Amino acid sequence: MKIPRDLSGAQLVKVLCRDWGYRVAHQEGSHIILQTEEPAHQRLSIPNHNPVRVGTLNSIIRAVSRHKGVERQELLDTLR
């Protein structure tokens, strides 16, 4: 599946918090900082832009899928 090109930062944060166990730690300017303790500590910086650039989104998806030990495709399916 292709990476969505119309996904906003707020939508991405909502999906990561709802489906993948992340929570909002704080916000610094236009970036929302998420963190999780499952399976280990990780912090992510999500730009609160509309839309999030494709390369940035791809990097975030890669980081989450590696940390959670899931396939990239499984993560992309939850973004739709």
Model-derived regions: residue spans:
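N-terminal first-folded block
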Residues: 1-28
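Short, flexible active-site loop motifs that bind/organize anionic cofactors or intermediates
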Residues: 2, 47, 65
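Compositionally biased, intrinsically disordered low-complexity segments
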Residues: 18, 27, 35-36, 64-67, ...
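A short, structured beta-strand/loop element
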Residues: 23-59
